[in-house]
Amino acid sequence: MKFRWNSRRFCQESSLERQFIFPRGIFMDLELDAVRRINKLAGQARPVDLMMDLITRYGHWAFLIYGILLWFAPGKNQKHRRESCVAAFLAVCLCSVISLAVGKLWHRGRPFTRDRQIWNFTGHKANASFPSNHAMNSAAVAFQLLRDRMPGCRWMACLAGLLAFSRLFAGMHYPSDILGGGAIAAAVHGVLNKPFAAAFIKKLTGALSLLSDSILYIGKSR
């Protein structure tokens, strides 16, 4: 429901209506205004626009490429690196399932559908806005990499933050979409790093390592 300020209507509303409707409407308007201000930065410097467009469209592929390199890179700590990859992958899967469920229960329209002045320069479709899948999944990966102290983890964390900002810059998400995605990622990260989950991840990593190494060996022997 869109909030529009009307002083006469507000005075006529009951105290109960004011208690629940007014704060929610004000919060949503403040969020929309924040997106509007950030989105106005677009179009002022073409190099920045191109960079943000690339990051918001394709930034998530950097995490996939990083994961592949981390998995196949040789070294003494390969087992530990692969466990980190599996944990990060499971986190993304669980986060995506939660996001899908939330989207079915609550469809929040994207900022550019509420205000035509917001420039949707990526041409993104008007599907559910909450939570931000890109911000959520990149945060889930970054949390795991930082915890396991993987090489380049800080750079990947910075990329996750930049990817989240780019979604605001492009007018595709509200700040609470980003924060909500981060909260889901943090919760999933906490669960997957419990002892019971860690034991499962070790077994799964062993099985996947055997499979990938066997395929690689067969490919080299041909």
What are these regions (language model features)?
Residues 16-27:
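Short, Lys/Arg-enriched N-terminal segments with co-localized hydrophobic residues
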Residues 25-128, 136-163:
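Hydrophobic alpha-helical bundle signature of multipass membrane enzymes
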Residues 120-222:
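Membrane-embedded catalytic cores of phosphoryl/pyrophosphoryl-handling enzymes
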